[in-house]
Regions:
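Nucleic-acid nuclease catalytic cores
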Residues: 138-148, 158-187, 209
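Flexible glycine-rich surface loops and low-complexity tracts that mediate binding to linear polymers
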Residues: 45-56, 209
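Short aromatic-glycine-enriched beta-strand elements
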Residues: 16-21
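Conserved catalytic cores of phosphodiester-cleaving nucleases, focusing on short active-site segments
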Residues: 9, 114-144, 157
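Beta-strand/loop nucleic-acid-binding surfaces
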Residues: 27-41
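Domain-level recognition of nuclease-like catalytic cores that cleave nucleotide substrates
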Residues: 174-232
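OB-fold/S1-family single-stranded nucleic acid-binding modules
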Residues: 57-73
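Acidic-basic catalytic patches of nuclease active cores, encompassing PD-(D/E)XK
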Residues: 40, 73-103
Length: 232
């Protein structure tokens, strides 16, 4: 997934979930943050950030903040929209299934809507995609805040399995160099427990890291998934 018109800046502060103040070429700019999550471990004052300049002159903000250079970690893409786009490209390119497949984004099934629907002569599968930006001690974790929506998605994937479909949770880790993925038990234990239930029900739990550069992000290598809970 490629970006265009990339600019470097320095993060100053974040008044709310949607905007941040960034110094660009000596000027303080109000920019759009493409992630409404907390991202406190990423958006530290003085951190080098990368932004995409909008081609829409009517926008209130001229830039989107998409990537940060985290100390001792390197580049992390924090754009919450890019995991789905990268996953669509990746699946279409044949990286997940050996046969040729047809991929449909945003597919509705019953009362649910899944990020990707994949079909071929061999399979019918739903894929839910989650972007992961939280990392500590070389462990990627999700979620960074309680997510009832995430729990709902997992239960819907279990239901799809019961109806005869294949079901996948694809965790797109928006960085390189992590050792493994774990649920963020301390932040939302119910999500971790539901993830364990989904695994037992046959849902495929996959995690992949990404090649991240200021102007692109591509899904790359598999990452071990650890669902055991040592947190009480």
């Amino acid at each position: 997934m490629k970006y265009e018109h990339i600019t470097e800046g320095r993060f100053i502060d974040r008044p709310n979930r949607f905007i941040a103040h960034v110094e660009i070429n000596g000027q303080v700019e109000t920019v759009h943050v493409k992630n409404t999550g907390r991202c406190r471990e990423l958006l530290v004052p003085g951190t080098q950030v990368f932004l995409e300049k909008s081609s829409n002159p009517a926008r209130k903000t001229a830039y989107d903040l998409i990537c940060v250079n985290k100390k001792d970690r390197g580049l992390i893409n924090m754009d919450s929209q890019i995991p789905n786009k990268a996953a669509l490209e990746w699946v279409k390119a044949g990286h997940l299934f050996p046969e040729k497949v047809q991929v449909t984004p945003e597919k509705t099934y019953g009362n649910s809507r899944f990020d990707l629907y994949v079909c071929s002569e061999k399979r019918k599968a739903f894929i839910e995609v989650k972007g992961v930006t939280l990392e500590s001690d070389n462990i990627a974790r999700f979620p960074d805040a309680p997510t009832e929506r995430g729990v709902k998605h997992l239960k819907e994937l279990i239901h799809c399995m019961q109806e005869g479909y294949e079901a996948y949770l694809l965790l797109v880790i928006q960085m390189k160099g992590v050792d493994r993925f774990e649920p963020n038990w301390e932040t939302h234990r119910e999500f971790g427990e539901t993830l364990q239930e989904a695994k037992k029900a046959g849902v495929h739990i996959l995690a992949y890291d990404c090649l991240v550069e200021p102007d692109r992000m591509e899904i790359q290598d598999p990452v071990p998934v650890c669902l055991a809970s040592d947190w009480k």
